[in-house]
């Protein structure tokens, strides 16, 4: 992709990883959005050798103001991949899906990460509502009302495993724009 957008910055590790991929490919841009970027994390990201590949935006990821700021960094015709990894409640992920789906290029994805929560609702430190209140439920609901997106796990092109199903923290996460 030309642009990788990720909601949820935390320590910035995935932003740095994506920036490294962009550098290796010789092109691309990473936009990281968070409601509150901790000052020490911002300093570390901005001091990193890959910082020039990253734009940080602070604010509510689903707000019109933040979405408009993100759009200002995307040129027309750019291939865009969106990863939603901030607040994992179903309601918030649905708001992000609605806010960002228009930026996703045909053939690319918007990914609602950490849907595995639904399978962890009954473990220590889990929450009973995770069974229905999770990113996978949001992605499935979104796909039902947006026929231009299909839930489609990317193929495993180099798997030597005998597994027949993907082992993932991101079930029902990959929404491909058709």
Q: Where are the regions that the model predicts?
A:
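S-adenosylmethionine/decaboxylated-SAM
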Residues: 1-178
């Amino acid at each position: 992709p030309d642009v990788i957008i990720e909601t949820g910055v935390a320590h910035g590790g995935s932003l740095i990883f994506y920036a490294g991929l962009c550098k290796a490919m010789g092109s691309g841009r990473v936009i990281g959005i968070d409601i509150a970027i901790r000052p020490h994390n911002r300093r570390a990201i901005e001091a990193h050798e890959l910082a020039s590949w990253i734009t940080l935006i602070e604010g509510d990821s689903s707000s019109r103001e933040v979405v408009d700021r993100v759009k200002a960094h995307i040129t027309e015709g750019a291939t865009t991949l969106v990863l939603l990894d901030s607040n994992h409640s179903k309601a918030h992920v649905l708001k992000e899906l609605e806010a960002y789906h228009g930026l996703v290029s045909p053939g690319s994805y918007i990914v609602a990460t950490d849907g595995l929560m639904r399978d962890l609702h009954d473990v220590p430190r889990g929450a009973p509502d995770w069974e229905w209140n999770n990113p996978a439920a949001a992605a499935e609901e979104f796909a039902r009302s947006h026929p231009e997106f299909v839930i489609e796990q990317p193929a495993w092109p180099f798997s030597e495993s005998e597994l027949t199903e993907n082992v993932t923290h991101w079930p029902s996460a990959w929404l491909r724009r058709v």
